[in-house]
UniProtKB/Swiss-Prot annotation:
Active-site residues annotated for this sequence: 2
Keyword field: Allosteric enzyme, Cytoplasm, Hydrolase, Metal-binding, Protease, Sodium, Threonine protease
Binding positions for Na(+) per the UniProt entry: 157, 160, 163
Record carries keyword Mitochondrion: no
Name of the top EC class for this enzyme: hydrolase
Job of this protein: Protease subunit of a proteasome-like degradation complex believed to be a general protein degrading machinery.
UniProt-listed Gene3D superfamilies: Glutamine Phosphoribosylpyrophosphate, subunit 1, domain 1
Name the record gives this protein: ATP-dependent protease subunit HslV
Domain of life where this protein originates: Bacteria
GO CC terms: HslUV protease complex; proteasome core complex
Family: Belongs to the peptidase T1B family. HslV subfamily.
Amino acid sequence: MTTILSVRLKNKVVIGGDGQATLGNTIMKSNVKKIRTLYHEKVIAGFAGGTADAFTLFEMFEKKLAMYQGQLPRAAIELAKDWRSDRMLRKLEALLAVADKDTSLIITGNGDVIQPEDDLIAIGSGGSYAQSAARALINNTTLNADEIVEKSLNIAANICIYTNHSFTIKELFSEK
């Protein structure tokens, strides 16, 4: 499992995640890159779940982004439709957190595409810890999105045994 967190504040969206890969109760790798830029670096995405499954979904999602000229909501919906309707794809176990300069979404294997009302996304085993920390920091500090993501991931990593302190953090800016 893992922790992926996305925070959108002012004119910036940031997605960060840890790098731990586990097999059962064993840490197999501590520096997996679970955050990627896609579609000419106009979309950032992170995954929670099986690594091989997530990379398969990243490839499919990148093809959908190209097919729909980078329209994030449309590409996400089309990926979710395929994921839900294809027998082989339904067996993939992963969640995607994706964002462009305007929109943040969660894509699930159940065919759900969810846009959080507060532009805060947290997925994975440490997601609820990171989300709680991020909400508290957003409401009670003047930290920027990068700082909130890093501090929240640190809090999650201190609590969740499936989350480590090896973070990858990426950001996008909007004209807003």
